[in-house]
Amino acid sequence: HLAPWDPTRSEEFFTEAGQLARTRELLALHALDTAVPLVIVDGDEIAGGLDLSNIVRGAFQSAMVGYWLDRGHTGRGLASVALTALLEACRDDFGLHRVQAATLLANHASQSVLTRAGFERIGVAPDYLKIAGRWQDHVLFQRILHD
């Protein structure tokens, strides 16, 4: 169910070895303070993922956020709860000032998650990301964490 919203992935990505390589890459980025990879849990199940990426320090103090949920865990507010908790950590623990997100124009569910978490729409970026095999426009959102 994520294929319309995700980059085209190699078959290797969906293997145990591919996921191990991805996990190692994410942990290496975390060690460099440029990413915070997280999982969303529902009881004892992994329900999805939440990634803070492209963390930039200095005068910018900003990052990108992305998230996904397994089909069986959508529509119950899990993404909103997880995103809200991450935003609190971004402000209180990581010292970030701003978090940005991008969604495909037709991804209204994700846009609702962002709006509920206090993000504001800041514009549309043409040909922003290569999703499902083609460059596609995205709606950009931001959340300013400090007054």
Predicted regions and their residues:
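Conserved acetyl-CoA-binding loop-helix of GNAT-fold acetyltransferases
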Residues: Y67-L69, G75-A89, H108-R116
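A contiguous pocket-lining binding segment that forms or flanks enzyme active sites
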Residues: L83, G95-A102
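Conserved G/P- and acidic residue-centered "switch" motifs that form tight phosphate/ATP-binding loops
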Residues: D44, G77, N107, G133
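Conserved active-site tyrosine of GNAT-family acetyltransferases
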Residues: L114, F119, F141
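Hydrophobic pocket-lining residues that define ligand/cofactor binding sites across diverse proteins
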Residues: C90-F94
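Conserved catalytic-core motifs of GNAT/GCN5-like acyltransferases
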Residues: Q100-A102, E120-D137
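GNAT-family acyltransferases
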Residues: H1-G72, W135-Q136, L140-D147
